[in-house]
Amino acid sequence: MAFNMDPKKCPMPTQDPNVRNKNFEEVAQGYTEEMAVNEAKRCIHCKNKPCQTGCPVGIDIPEFIGHVAEGDFEAAYQVIARSSSLPAVCGRVCPQESQCEGKCTRGIKNEPVGIGRLERFVADWHRENVHTAPIVPAWNGHKVAIIGAGPAGLTAAGDLAKLGYKVTVYEALHVAGGVLMYGIPEFRLPKAIVQQEIDGLKKMGVDFECNMVIGKVLTIDELMGEYGYEAVFVGSGAGLPRFMGIPGESLKGVYSANEFLTRSNLMKAYLPTSKTPIRTGKKVAVVGGGNVAMDAARSALRLGAETVYIVYRRGMAELPARKEEVEHAEEEGIIFKTLCNPVEIHANDEGFVKSITCIEMELGEPDASGRRRPIEKTGSEFELDVDTVIMSLGTSPNPLIRSTTPGLETNKHGCIVTEGDEGKTSREGVYAGGDAVTGAATVIKAMGAGKAAAKAMDEYIQNQ
């Protein structure tokens, strides 16, 4: 097979920025078969597979890419499916530049192989062309409970179902999917794709119980007692928003990004018939610089805002959001106000937001995270006229589970404490992973935690 030594990735077809910023259709439109084969031929098949070491779920990346290069897309899918339950999701939202593609040898001198784009292509090809029912293994006589139907819970459920366990997933919201459904907008991750992944788990025998808030409706003790589950995995995420604690945060027109995106993504607040409409003003400030901030800003634009600012206390180079998301936001007309931070939100006579006062920042010495610490510049305050403020400052786990589960150790941030990478908690038979343990992180890291915990749960039960 001849290698393709093009120094750049095959470009991803996308909607025109001036069209897409007015709709919720998917921005990136995916590779054609020809594009996928050509991109796959850029892989030089390193013997030590550095890209695989960068994948939290351990996909054999050179093997699946080799099948793509040969045009055998179903064989490529089967390689991915050995390690990942959600390839169509990961191909769209994983930060490949800091994981698999960040380790790619081609990326040392040129652009890395477009691993995420190829994973997406393979998953989409399989979904559109293969319609065989999954193989359902015989029941092994054991049953387990999963708390939370987000990426960690879905991954653990899928892996345990493949081993023959009777798996029940308890989800607090009215639909399964967790952050994949409520947190990531349709234009980045279509909900039909997430639903299809969930439907695949249902076909494998996984049961989903929605509108079940564990800690209120049932406790972990009840699940392991009268309900007879031999092990429980807690993948309840981190959905409790953080705020700055500045004057004016309780004004009308101030949202957490969590609420703003949930109402838009899950409750379709952008439809005229919506029962949960969002009051998006003409000028919106989104405070924060991560992927969630980009999602909120780009959603606000699509909901009718004329001007949307990203207000971030560090510089453009320090933005934690994916490079692709920042580029897409800039293309769509989002204005980046970096090296500044809000200090107060002001109201009009009716109690609605009318402006925010910000202060300019400069970067000092590195802090504990390794990033340079932002320092206020005395006397540099300025006012920004906005009528909506969206706070995107991270999230913490909900305290319900820890407050209703005696003996479950948590840290000062409310995250569940686990041993090593296996997800074992201080309670026997209780495992945890994803954002409930780490705080807000990436989809693929949550999946990796769910995968590791499923393996540990199986070993625990089989050794009883």
Please report, for each region that a protein language model flagged, where it lies by residue.
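Rossmann-like dinucleotide-binding cores of NAD(P)H-dependent redox enzymes
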Residues: V169, L173-K203, D207-F208, A297-E344
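N-terminal Rossmann-like FAD-binding beta1-loop-alpha1 element of flavoenzymes
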Residues: H142-T168, A293-L301
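Ferredoxin-type iron-sulfur electron-transfer modules in oxidoreductases and energy-metabolism complexes
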Residues: R20-N38, I59-R92, K109-V136, S264-N265
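FAD-site-proximal beta/loop scaffold in flavoenzymes
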Residues: S250-G281, P366-A440
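Glycine-rich dinucleotide-binding loop and its adjacent helix/turn
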Residues: V122-A138, Q196-K216, P241-L303, N411-D421, ...
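Feature captures the FAD/FMN-dependent oxidoreductase FAD-binding
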Residues: A75, A138-W139, K143-I147, Q195-I246, ...
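Local cysteine-cluster metal-coordination motifs and their immediate loop/turn environment
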Residues: K41-E63, S85-I108
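A conserved FAD-binding loop/helix module that cradles the flavin
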Residues: A436-N463
